[in-house]
Amino acid sequence: MSTYLVGDVHGCLVELKALLAQVSFNPEQDTLWLTGDLVARGPDSLQVLRFVRSLGSSVRMVLGNHDLHLLAVYAGISRNKPKDRLNDLLTAPDADELINWLRRQPILQVDEDLKLVMAHAGITPQWDLPTALVCAREVESILSSDSYPLFLDAMYGDMPNHWSPELSGLARLRFSTNVFTRMRYCFSGGQLDMLCKEQPGQAPSLLKPWFDLPSQVAGEYAIAFGHWASLEGKGTPENIYALDTGCCWGGELTMLRWDDKRYFTQPSLSSNTELSGDITL
């Protein structure tokens, strides 16, 4: 029985299956953790959702910003952009079933036995783990409810960018969503900067990658995240693992076997080279 962590799939089904074949993944014995952004930009978003769903309880995934964007597009709240390559999914006969399954997936995973935490973008240094869990469950609760279109309509935006326990309502949900699915840089006080997408070292000096600020979580737990492909899996402190290595942009799909911390990679087999930045979400 092994635990495998895989970075952002982004519709790259062939690469995902090839990576699983490298380790002879057995869904009856092994567990697959996915950092989110299953869909968009790559060629096979529909088949990725079908495949991941078919793996049942052997999968522990989190939602990413592109997954949330898909939910908003399907709900008629956001526009379907050709570069996201979602048409097959949106018009599939089982689209309703897949969308309803997707919106009931977690936004944060915590395993107390493994001392492992996973979120698509990371955990703000302003939170301890109990706070992160509360905020995650609030987002998950509304996403799985009949009120989810109201949340999807309100989630777009960069403010508020600073945590306060007094935050409430849609503003609180938006902040939490930005932390879990969009965050890269913070100011020294922990406030989110949602604009900078430069690589570390090229960002303004006032900004720090979230993982370079003192963490209230990473001392006791490992943190795995995706989202930030330009990191190429490098430059994070000990006990923090960046797993998005840009497969859909011609990079590779990365897997970490948690048991022995061994990495496996699968080079991209797709031809999508239209790297044009993340959607604003």
From Swiss-Prot:
Q: Which PANTHER family match?
A: CYTOCHROME C5, PTHR40942
This protein is called: Bis(5'-nucleosyl)-tetraphosphatase, symmetrical
| Chain segments annotated as coiled-coil in the UniProt record | none
Q: Which family does it belong to?
A: Belongs to the Ap4A hydrolase family.
Q: Which GO terms describe its molecular function?
A: bis(5'-nucleosyl)-tetraphosphatase (symmetrical) activity
Q: Which Gene3D superfamilies match?
A: 3.60.21.10
Record field: catalytic activity: P(1),P(4)-bis(5'-adenosyl) tetraphosphate + H2O = 2 ADP + 2 H(+)
Question: What is the organism of origin for this protein?
Answer: Pectobacterium atrosepticum (strain SCRI 1043 / ATCC BAA-672) (Erwinia carotovora subsp. atroseptica)
Outline what the protein does: Hydrolyzes diadenosine 5',5'''-P1,P4-tetraphosphate to yield ADP.
Q: Which HAMAP family match?
A: ApaH (MF_00199)
Q: What is its EC number?
A: 3.6.1.41
Q: Which domain of life is it from?
A: Bacteria
Q: Which UniProt keywords apply?
A: Hydrolase
Pfam families xref list: Metallophos
